[in-house]
Amino acid sequence: MDTRLINIGFGNIVAAGRVIAIVSPESAPIKRIISDARERGQLVDATYGRRTRAVIITDSGHVILSAIQPETVANRFLTAKVGAPEEPE
């Protein structure tokens, strides 16, 4: 399993292997996903009271709100993937 960690702002970190999507929160379907996750108790607000700029969806159904841009999160995700040494088989 992928054990690399991605910083999503303000000292909050998620496991890279669990991330399915990193999206912007403006569209109605994403707002609905956030609302549904809040009702299910699977919403993690990592914005520290700031404006939500990225929504991270995990394979466990959790929805994580971040105050940094989706592009920034994606770049950190790609850097962690490329910069890490290959695991032996």
From Swiss-Prot:
InterPro entries: RemA-like. Signal peptide: none annotated. It comes from the Bacteria. Belongs to the RemA family. HAMAP family: RemA. PANTHER family: REGULATORY PROTEIN SSL2874-RELATED, REGULATORY PROTEIN TM_1690-RELATED. This is Putative regulatory protein CYA_2696.
